[in-house]
Regions:
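An N-terminal, well-structured beta->alpha segment
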Residues: 1-63, 67-68, 150-176
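Gly/Ser/Thr-enriched, mixed-charge loops and adjacent short helices
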Residues: 13, 108-230
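N-terminal small/polar loop signature for handling phosphorylated ligands or for N-terminal nucleophile
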Residues: 32, 40-107, 192-250
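Conserved PLP-anchoring active-site segment centered on the Schiff-base-forming lysine
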Residues: 44-46, 179, 277-282
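Proline/glycine-rich low-complexity loops and linkers
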Residues: 82, 126-161, 166, 253-325
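Short beta-strand-to-turn element immediately C-terminal to the catalytic PLP-Schiff-base lysine
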Residues: 112-115, 248-252, 296
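Short acidic/histidine-rich active-site segments
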Residues: 238-241, 322-328
């Protein structure tokens, strides 16, 4: 873990720990590193969740990026995976997500993706840290037309939902489902997605007001969803976290279906369809013994990594595995 970036970006209480000055410095440093790597004027996408501080930090990041000569395209409120996907689709050089995931609204964070939609390597993060914290390089100060430009993308959500539908082979017609959006990024996408899949859904906590993100709702407070599903006899329910990069589920009795169970079920389905590349499923050391026993009993190789989705993805990419995830 670095001095500024943890396993999931830079995080802290917005405006005291993660200040506008820090965000602007990260923007400047990121643009400097991108120019050094790409040898051209870079274009950076920025997405955000629904926290009241996200607009403030977005403005600071934009100022930092543009002041060094990077162009910025604003995606608005989107899930974190949307930024990772759209970087490639829009052929941008990097993407930044402003979010603190499952944390309360007081917190916020900055997560950077490279041009392939993967989190930055440790080396590039350390280079950014050295510029921000140690003043390792002096930022350039372009003028006139060399200053970065800002544009807004009005179709980011549509493009992301269309992508999800293209890669999802499932028919939810006739299923009564409850979906908890955590008053976060899923509020912008879940209704369109589940409706297009044919599900008969009720959407909970999909009215964000800037401060109610993750407030007694979402994947870290799944009791509300469990009670709702059980009492109203729904088929099941899905709960997202604030930036919609994780979800948990409940069955018709309100029983928790955690990440281990979701990964096990998906891996088994893929194995039966002949789609489980490497015949393995990647998880972290936090996965429970039941997951490993299930895999062994069903001829699936469980592969463990350090905690953090970046390490799961690295293992999947490096070894050619088709599925991976975290217990949480």
């Amino acid at each position: 873990m670095g001095r500024l970036f943890g396993t999931d970006g830079a995080r802290g209480v917005a405006n005291t720990e993660l200040t506008c000055e820090t965000a602007m410095s990260i923007g400047r440093a990121a643009a400097m590193v991108l120019i050094e790597v790409e040898h051209r004027r870079p274009r950076v996408l920025i997405g955000k969740d629904t926290r009241v501080s996200s607009d403030m930090l977005e403005a600071a990041l934009v100022a930092g990026l543009c002041s060094v000569g990077a162009d910025v395209q604003l995606l608005g409120v989107v899930p974190t995976p949307a930024v990772a996907y759209l970087v490639g689709k829009y052929q941008a050089d990097a993407g930044i997500m402003i979010s603190a995931s499952h944390n309360p609204c007081e917190y916020n964070g900055i997560k950077i993706f490279n041009g392939e939609g993967y989190k930055l390597s440790d080396n590039l993060e350390e280079e950014i840290e050295a510029i921000v914290l140690d003043g390792a390089q002096t930022p350039p100060t372009p003028t006139g037309g060399d200053i970065g430009r800002v544009s807004r993308c009005d179709h980011a959500v549509d493009d992301y939902v269309r992508h999800l539908l293209d890669v999802t082979d499932v028919d939810l017609r006739g299923m009564r489902l409850a979906v908890d959006c955590a008053n976060g990024s899923a509020s912008a996408t879940a209704r369109r997605l589940f409706s297009a899949l044919g599900a008969d859904c009720v959407f909970l906590n999909d009215q964000p007001d800037g401060v109610n993100i993750n407030e007694n709702c979402g994947s870290t407070h799944i009791e509300q969803l469990a009670d709702f599903v059980k009492k109203l006899k729904y088929y099941g329910g899905v709960a997202f976290d604030g930036d919609a990069d994780r979800c948990l589920a409940v069955d018709e009795q309100g029983n928790l279906i955690d990440g281990d169970k979701i990964i096990a079920a998906l891996a088994m389905d893929m194995k039966e369809k002949g789609e489980l590349d490497g015949n393995a499923a990647v998880v972290t050391v936090m996965s429970n013994l039941g997951f490993f026993r299930f895999c062994e009993q069903n001829g699936i190789t469980p592969v463990s990594t350090k905690v953090g989705d970046r390490y799961v993805l690295e293992e999947m990419v490096n070894s050619g595995y088709a599925i991976g995830g975290e217990q949480s």
